[in-house]
Amino acid sequence: MEVIARPPLSRWSYRHVLDLAAFSQEDYATVLELASRFRALPMSGPRRLPALQGRLVTTLFFEPSTRTRSSFELAARRLSADVQSFSPASSALAKGESLLDTARTYVAMGADVLVVRHRCAGVPAELARDLEAAGCRTAVLNAGDGLHSHPSQALLDLFTLARHFNPETPTLEALAGKRIVIVGDVLHSRVARSNLWSLTACGVDVVLCGPASLLPDAFAQFTHAPPPGQAQDLVAQRGSLRIERDLDRALEGADAVMTLRLQQERMKEQLITSLEAYHQRYGLSHRRLERCGKSVPVLHPGPVNRGVELSGELLDDPSRSLVEEQVRNGIPVRMALLYLMAASEPASSAAGLS
């Protein structure tokens, strides 16, 4: 129980986590601190904490998912929450029920947290507004909505980088002043958008790289603007953002590289000439990373297209690839989010209303 002694709930003010636009540096520090404590738990023997015993976490995924859904469900179970999974194919949606009525059904069953993924941007926020209008105290956690946001992925990426730069003390100070390159299909990536918010807010200099068809110039303005009344920063500087079209130039002086999947299922037209040509210009390999001048780590939110975003040899190199570490870190980070959201709220009634 020591891992959750004196939890930082007094520093947490969000019922819902829909994106990271309002997050202050203190909010990021709170998540990293709690994730570090959960990450320190032994991986053998009893793995459950009673922190969310009696709570119900419902995962509403309207898009396919391996890592995110499994990670959230494992995180909830490790906190002793009950877990309820939703499958669109076997739900009343096929009979014409609205998404809101489906969500209200799960709230009526006692859901304390709805973890929502949807192909359309704004759906989790709309659900949160509608549930609040109905007087419901159920929290909504965005697990990815269209091209908009994927906050838990950005938080686990932040945690992974902080642990890499300072394994003993993975704090914001470990990130400040670092240079991170994000390369690939930024246009269709909710992960990239969330990482731009989190990284620049925490003092990281970001270099975006990709072809103009997948990285419009407008992204140069996509930085974190501190919300009004934000608490005093924990690190002095805020990160910068620039676009570089040439990958070899972008990699010079980088401290880490994140590559993004080509999301061809979201492309309405041909945006690249071929996968081979894309890999030649923007794919990562050991040889290309020599441009960094040091042994830099590689991240990828998954799923990975081997031989497209990065070579199979690089993906399988444990001295360079942090991809599996990202997966491992997803569990304690999502434990932290669920704990902060659910433990700070009174358990919902059977009807899910306050």
Swiss-Prot record:
Note the subunit structure. Answer: Heterododecamer (2C3:3R2) of six catalytic PyrB chains organized as two trimers (C3), and six regulatory PyrI chains organized as three dimers (R2).
Q: What is its EC number?
A: 2.1.3.2
User: Which reaction equations make up its catalytic activity?
Assistant: carbamoyl phosphate + L-aspartate = N-carbamoyl-L-aspartate + phosphate + H(+)
TM spans (from-to): none
**Protein name as annotated:** Aspartate carbamoyltransferase catalytic subunit
Residues that hold L-aspartate according to the record: 95, 190, 261
Highest taxon of the lineage = Bacteria
Q: What class of enzyme is it?
A: transferase
Q: Which NCBIfam families match?
A: asp_carb_tr, PRK00856.1
Spell out the molecular function terms from Gene Ontology.
amino acid binding; aspartate carbamoyltransferase activity
For the ligand (carbamoyl phosphate), the binding residues are: 67-68, 117, 150, 153, 302-303
Job description of the protein: Catalyzes the condensation of carbamoyl phosphate and aspartate to form carbamoyl aspartate and inorganic phosphate, the committed step in the de novo pyrimidine nucleotide biosynthesis pathway.
